[in-house]
Amino acid sequence: MNVYTAAPMDLTLSHSEAVEIVLAYARFWLAMAYTIVATVVMFTLTLFGLLVPGDAGRRWQLFCARTWAAGILRAARCPVVVTRLSTAPPPAGGFLYFSNHHSMLDILALFVALKETPFVFAAKRELFKVPFIGWHLRLAGYIEVDRQNRDRAISSFTRAARQIRERGTVVTVYPEGTRSVDGTILPFKKGPFMLALEAQVPIVPIAVDGAQLALRKHTLRLHGHPIRVVIGNAIETRGLAQADRDDLLRRTRLAILDLHRMAGAGPSPIEPMIAPPGKRTGERE
């Protein structure tokens, strides 16, 4: 009888690897300390926007948010590189930005990249409970989405569609509904496309890559890394009905996959396009 023994695995880290791990954790906590201070200061300044009526107040709030985001990314050593495929200005009136989502840094990168017009995010309900950040979200008119309750999520999208039509609001949405952990693009939720069709406004597709290499989901190690943002051409929804939802989802997904490759990312699966019903996430571990 032959007995085979596996060779022991060498788990020893080199000196340079150990130093990089320590520095990655140190960068995270230094950036976190800066974030806390910057959040308190910029939230306080944001309150002045409430005293200014109309678009000027919203622009002030967005200026504060962009300054906050740019400062954090500088502290994290994550420069944002932006590519726009269209030379035309953004669509007039309200419209939707649809972007993939890898990391919390994606949000900051979009604040820096999307300078053309004031916008708000459709954000998960849990963020509205975070001190300072949640208060800013409410004051700035962000769209609250309850991922735990389908009926409330649909209701929030219906209100958002009315706000987009009547006020010309621009909303940024993550159709995956969560962050991917491996850098690929997850299946899309149907709700955001119901919103687009209800509002009858264009979708501007966006791809972001690099943020997942700077700060991965479920980790506290921060690595300085460029974040690339590619902004595509608008996809029109005017005249489409809810029966066209899946086709609109397919066209938008293919557009974002193309932009993602242009950003330098590896291939993402085309299928499945649609996230299974009843599941809050679809993340790949």
Where are these regions (language model features)?
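Non-catalytic C-terminal accessory region of glycerolipid acyltransferases
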Residues: 2-18, 22, 154-285
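A transmembrane-helix-recognition feature enriched in membrane-embedded lipid enzymes
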Residues: 14-81, 135-139
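Catalytic core of membrane glycerolipid acyltransferases/transacylases, capturing the structured
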Residues: 46-63, 73-75, 89-150
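Hydrophobic alpha-helical segments typical of transmembrane helices
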Residues: 68, 106-109, 132, 191-192, ...
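Generic preference for hydrophobic
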Residues: 82, 97, 121, 229-231
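A short beta-turn/loop motif at secondary-structure boundaries
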Residues: 86-90, 221-222
